[in-house]
């Protein structure tokens, strides 16, 4: 019996664990601190800084099963998903990595053993082919002489992409930086399937399928294109879980593996589909994976960047459900089946199931309201089409007006053998496409980045003053030996009390000083394992090797500690008051305020905000001890410690506990006891995205300041109302009631004045071909009274055309009224449009009533004078 996908995943990790590799959990689909990458799209993403020499780990071998998304840029698989055997928006990348440890020999031997050993995957050796880079004789000889693959199944691939080192078998991180040749392993499905081996004219067929890519990072590419050998060559490999599952389960399409068969059956059940070969089932089965995991990792549907890509995928899935005949919301119902089929890889998703389902349901309901209208408009346009291409402007209008992603437009057109003018669409969508575009590499010159080989020891948990030594200096990203007064720089010390920004807590400020210099620290950041003090040398000079005294701004750090500890208390309180679906989606902790983003689907009620405040303040009054313990990551999770969204953790973690109330993983700085916080107050609660709320709060002196400010405002209002705080509510109600009464009386007076003005105006109407025409500019009349006046005048004048205007604060307000017996000849909307155009405005409305505005008051007299001629022409 063949292995399940879950068993294949586990076997891969177990094999490399047996070879001394650290099993590392999948990182978030949202890359950590990497703005150049839209989504995690390869297993090596979380180790990028290790490969670049910017970070160090306590292991030199690692293995992962990494969740990946490719949609939205160079790796945009969206339009092909469901129509080919191997395109996905979401996939899992199995990988093993060596950071300056083993190299080509072991990497190749490990791969061969896992694939062919009877204990592991037991693939027939004669079915495996390999490629190597044309000049990589070392890899070729390992495959031929050590592994024993016949020469005819080892293929050299040269620079087949039109430039030096531009090859399917040469991997580059970017224009500069680590790169090297790679060897790829292919599986031959047999001659009953069309296709040729790699490098042949028939290589795009489905017979020979790449299952594993092994990259040998051995060069550092310079800006001038030269290749310098890396001092410690590394290995980065990737094998698509879905691809190897298809091979091991003896099927030719990824969509026929056990995981997808189960999901496709679930899709058929919720949509009512009966034909299990329908490609729309594949589309939806793929899309639920990317959508659910993206939401679980904090991405919310929106019209920008990652949220826009998520929205496109959701809407494409909903549209395919619509094609299958789904009559009600269905997509969210697939989260449960997905969790079941993902096994241990779905544990994070299971914890957030309710939140993910709610976001999907809300988005689907929102799109359902526009889908029908958008499809109808597209049908109209296609019916009028004379050629075989839909113009880009129409495709953009569908997006802009109906939120209809171009992918959906292309899908509909594809079914009718019609192309979409993508160039025209791109021109209209350039800005949105720029925001959503995924960088093809890592988009930076890594030779210019700050690289710190040494590590800094952080001692700020116990010290705010410390003596250290300068180990590195950087100016404009470049290492220097010394800096002088007035220069801005980054200073790295061997040990420091300064906390570097992470976990939502801002970096420390303070001073580095010595006998002859003073360096003002304005921020502190991490650079791999080093801590950089960012600021300006106020006096003297500073050079590498100098001894310094590092002094943290103690008062500022104290305020930050209170805010950070209060954040933990508030997180726990939110889960008690609102439910355990609450999870952190982001945070900011500085010396003035704490800001906390969390998953919740509706605005908090005033009583819920009060309950959270009361609960936090109750823990403050309990004066609970705040304790930290260092333990293994898995032990911390077993203890119930909550992890912070988007953070990376080592295998040994710091667990922060506040009595029996809160336990979280946290590397930040905190108060000693909850009582130190003093007071906690929420100052705002708002929404930041669908399903995400934001609270801002203050503590300690900041909270007391808000109490004083509220009290001062209350006293001022009481003084103005000639009352005291005890009966203030009654006073305000009385004033509001009196105000409402006066406004009502004022409105009645205005209406009486307008009626009188209308009576006076009616005598100014002139006859134009049997129709009364009245055109007038009014002074002292509110724009909102114009409509009432037109109605009165129409009643008085019978067959009539009326144009009234007024100017308030430099803005022109216009209205046109036409009696219904005249609308077949003169339409109010056309008339008002003609006038508005002359005063720099626009407007519209019904044939019998239309309004407009304008900005050019000086042009109003001439515009009104033109009405008579225009009307006369229409009435002839």
Curated annotation (Swiss-Prot):
Keywords: Acetylation, Aminoacyl-tRNA synthetase, ATP-binding, Cytoplasm, Ligase, Metal-binding, Nucleotide-binding, Protein biosynthesis, RNA-binding, tRNA-binding, Zinc. It holds the Pfam family tRNA-synt_2c. Catalyzes the attachment of alanine to tRNA(Ala) in a two-step reaction: alanine is first activated by ATP to form Ala-AMP and then transferred to the acceptor end of tRNA(Ala). Also edits incorrectly charged Ser-tRNA(Ala) and Gly-tRNA(Ala) via its editing domain. This is Alanine--tRNA ligase. It is found in: Cytoplasm. Zn(2+) binds at residues 564, 568, 666, 670. PANTHER family: ALANINE--TRNA LIGASE, CYTOPLASMIC, ALANYL-TRNA SYNTHETASE. Consists of three domains; the N-terminal catalytic domain, the editing domain and the C-terminal C-Ala domain. The editing domain removes incorrectly charged amino acids, while the C-Ala domain, along with tRNA(Ala), serves as a bridge to cooperatively bring together the editing and aminoacylation centers thus stimulating deacylation of misacylated tRNAs. The modification N6-acetyllysine is found at residue 74. GO terms for molecular function: alanine-tRNA ligase activity; aminoacyl-tRNA deacylase activity; ATP binding; tRNA binding; zinc ion binding. It comes from Escherichia coli O1:K1 / APEC.
């Amino acid at each position: 019996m063949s292995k399940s996908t879950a068993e294949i995943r586990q076997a891969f990790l177990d094999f490399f664990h047996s070879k001394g590799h650290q099993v590392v959990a999948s990182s978030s689909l949202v890359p950590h601190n990497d703005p150049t990458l839209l989504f995690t799209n390869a297993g090596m993403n979380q180790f990028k800084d290790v490969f670049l020499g910017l970070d160090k780990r306590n292991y030199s071998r690692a293995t992962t099963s990494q969740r990946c998304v490719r949609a939205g840029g160079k790796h945009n698989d969206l339009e092909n998903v469901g129509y080919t055997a191997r395109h996905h928006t979401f996939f899992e990348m199995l990988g093993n990595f060596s950071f300056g440890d083993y190299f080509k020999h072991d990497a190749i031997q490990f791969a061969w053993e896992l694939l062919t050993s009877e204990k592991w995957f037991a693939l027939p050796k004669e079915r495996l082919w390999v490629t190597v880079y044309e000049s990589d004789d070392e890899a070729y000889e390992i495959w031929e002489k050590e592994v024993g693959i016949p020469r005819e199944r080892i293929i050299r691939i040269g620079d087949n992409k039109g430039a030096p080192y531009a090859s399917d078998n040469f991997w580059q991180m970017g224009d500069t930086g680590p790169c090297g040749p790679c060897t790829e392993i292919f599986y031959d499905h047999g001659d009953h399937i069309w296709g040729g081996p790699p490098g042949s004219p028939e290589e795009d067929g489905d017979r020979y399928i790449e299952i594993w890519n092994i990259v040998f990072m051995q060069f550092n590419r310079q800006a001038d294109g030269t290749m310098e050998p890396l001092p410690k060559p590394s290995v980065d490999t990737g094998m698509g879980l879905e691809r190897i599952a298809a091979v091991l389960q003896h099927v030719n399409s990824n969509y026929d593996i056990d995981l997808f068969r189960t999901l496709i059956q679930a899709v058929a059940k919720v949509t009512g589909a009966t034909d299990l070969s329908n490609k729309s089932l594949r589309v939806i089965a793929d899309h639920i994976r990317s959508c659910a995991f993206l939401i679980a990792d904090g991405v919310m549907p929106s019209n920008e960047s990652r949220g826009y890509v998520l929205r496109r995928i959701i809407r494409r899935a909903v549209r395919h459900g619509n094609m299958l005949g789904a009559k009600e919301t269905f997509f969210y119902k697939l989260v449960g089946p997905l969790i079941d089929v993902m096994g241990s890889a779905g544990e994070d998703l299971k914890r957030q199931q309710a939140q993910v389902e709610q976001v999907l349901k809300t988005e689907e309901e929102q799109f359902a309201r526009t889908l029908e209208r958008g499809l109808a408009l597209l049908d109209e346009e296609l019916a009028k089409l004379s050629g075989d291409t839909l113009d880009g402007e129409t495709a953009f209008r569908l997006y802009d007006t109906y939120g209809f992603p171009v992918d959906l437009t292309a899908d509909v057109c594809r079914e009718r053998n019609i192309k979409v003018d993508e160039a025209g669409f791109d021109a209209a969508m350039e800005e949105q496409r720029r925001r959503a575009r995924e960088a093809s590499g890592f988009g930076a010159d890594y030779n210019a980045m700050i690289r710190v080989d040494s590590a800094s020891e952080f001692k700020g948990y116990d010290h705010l003053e410390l003596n250290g030594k300068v180990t590195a200096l950087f100016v404009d990203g470049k290492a220097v030996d010394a800096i002088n007064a007035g220069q801005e720089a980054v200073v790295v010390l061997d040990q420091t009390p300064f906390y570097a920004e992470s976990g939502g807590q801002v970096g420390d400020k303070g001073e580095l000083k010595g006998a002859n210099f003073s360096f003002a620290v304005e921020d502190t950041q991490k650079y791999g394992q080093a801590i950089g003090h960012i600021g300006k040398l106020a006096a003297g000079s500073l050079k590498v090797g100098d001894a310094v005294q590092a002094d943290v701004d103690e008062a500022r750090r104290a305020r930050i500690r209170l805010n950070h500890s209060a954040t933990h208390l508030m997180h726990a309180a939110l889960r008690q008051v609102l439910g355990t679906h609450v999870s952190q989606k982001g945070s900011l902790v500085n010396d003035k305020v704490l800001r906390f983003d969390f998953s919740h689907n509706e605005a908090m009620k005033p009583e819920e905000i009060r309950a959270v405040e009361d609960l936090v303040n109750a823990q403050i009054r309990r004066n609970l001890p705040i304790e930290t313990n260092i333990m293994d990551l898995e032990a911390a999770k077993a203890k119930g410690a909550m992890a912070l969204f988007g953070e990376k953790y080592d295998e040994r973690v710091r667990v922060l506990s506040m009595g029996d109330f809160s336990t979280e993983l946290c590397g930040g700085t905190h108060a000693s006891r909850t009582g130190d916080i003093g007071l906690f107050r929420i100052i705002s609660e708002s929404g930041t995205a669908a399903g995400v709320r934001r609270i801002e709060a203050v503590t300690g002196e900041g909270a007391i300041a808000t109490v004083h400010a509220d009290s001062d405002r209350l006293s001022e209002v009481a003084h103005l109302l000639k009352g005291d705080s005890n009966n203030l509510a009654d006073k305000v109600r009385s004033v509001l009631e009196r105000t409402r009464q006066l406004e009502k009386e004022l409105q009645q007076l205005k209406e009486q004045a307008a009626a009188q003005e209308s009576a006076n105006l009616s005598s100014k109407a002139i006859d134009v071909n049997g129709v009364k025409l009245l055109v007038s500019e009014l002074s002292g009349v509110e724009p909102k009274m114009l409509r009432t006046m037109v109605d009165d005048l129409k009643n008085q004048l019978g067959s009539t055309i009326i144009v009234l205007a007024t100017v308030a604060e430099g803005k022109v307000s216009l209205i046109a009224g036409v009696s219904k017996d005249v609308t077949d000849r003169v339409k109010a909307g056309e008339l008002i449009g003609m006038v508005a155009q002359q005063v720099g405005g626009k407007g519209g409305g019904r044939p019998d009533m239309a309004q407009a505005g304008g900005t050019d008051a000086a042009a109003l007299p001439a515009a009104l004078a033109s009405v008579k001629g225009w009307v006369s022409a229409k009435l002839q």
